[in-house]
Amino acid sequence: MKPMKTSWADEVEADYVDGLPPSKEYTQGNLKFVAEYKYNEDGKKVKVVRTYKIQKQTVPKVVARRRNWSKFGDSLLDKPGPCSQTTMVAEEVHMVFISSKELEQAQAQEPQVEPGKNIARCRICNGEHWSVNCPYKGTSMDSKTLMESKATAAAAAAVSDASKTGKYVSPFLKEGGCAIGGGIGIGAKPWVRERSAVRISNLSESMTEADLEELVKKIGPHTKLYLAREKNTGLCKGFAYVHFKFRQDAAAAIEILNGHGYDHLILCVEWSKPQP
């Protein structure tokens, strides 16, 4: 009895009943195609074809020899070069080697800073410190000229208003309250000192006496500063009182600081109300 003849497709399928067919590779021009077989999530046999673009480049001899090193472990039977299943190629990092002579020439071309010279210069007040450390950052007192002009205008307005009314002005209000001795001193009566006192509110909790003095010292001389603090925490309550020596300076402080920003807050400056 003659053996039954089978088709070549049945023979190929019979050879790989227990396994998957081997992968196949072929090239076409500058493209390389790799066909692989695997089982998908449903248990079905599928064919996966990967396409690679072949690029030729010149590499150093040590790099070429390193690519031909014998592999080991799970990659023992892999071909030379990286395998996509076990190796992931990251982006190339190009190194530039500079000799010490080129580095010295680059350093010689850099501008030299004179020793002992302060390179810090504030762009707000032109002081010898960085702008980030300027006490007048974010306020209307960013310019000394602007502050002086506002103070002069406020003082002139206060004097002109008093002269236009034609009413009687007591001696301690004339010339900024300097009828005797040139100003309102600490020993003056409380109701006299309150004529040149202002109340500054909406201050931050981190406000200190030093910050308050820095805020008002360029406006005019003052005789007393009071910063309200919490008893337990010692933090600022949000308001303070400043007693200026001259009334026109107090008016200038209201004109300059009221409604302007300080420490990310909008200040409210007004005349201090007499205590009952």
Swiss-Prot record:
List the SMART domains.
RRM
Q: Where is the RRM domain?
A: 196-274
One of the Pfam families matching this protein, by short name: RRM_1
Compartment(s): Cytoplasm
Q: Main localisation, per the record?
A: cytoplasm
Output the Gene Ontology cellular-component terms: eukaryotic 43S preinitiation complex; eukaryotic 48S preinitiation complex; eukaryotic translation initiation factor 3 complex
Q: Give the GO biological process terms.
A: formation of cytoplasmic translation initiation complex
Keyword line = Cytoplasm, Initiation factor, Protein biosynthesis, RNA-binding
One example GO MF annotation: RNA binding
Q: How does it assemble?
A: Component of the eukaryotic translation initiation factor 3 (eIF-3) complex. The eIF-3 complex interacts with pix.
Q: Which PANTHER family is this protein grouped with?
A: EUKARYOTIC TRANSLATION INITIATION FACTOR 3 SUBUNIT G (PTHR10352)
Q: What does this protein do?
A: RNA-binding component of the eukaryotic translation initiation factor 3 (eIF-3) complex, which is involved in protein synthesis of a specialized repertoire of mRNAs and, together with other initiation factors, stimulates binding of mRNA and methionyl-tRNAi to the 40S ribosome. The eIF-3 complex specifically targets and initiates translation of a subset of mRNAs involved in cell proliferation. This subunit can bind 18S rRNA.
Regarding protein family, the annotation reads:
Belongs to the eIF-3 subunit G family.
Q: What is this protein called?
A: Eukaryotic translation initiation factor 3 subunit G-2
Q: Which organism is it from?
A: Drosophila persimilis (Fruit fly)
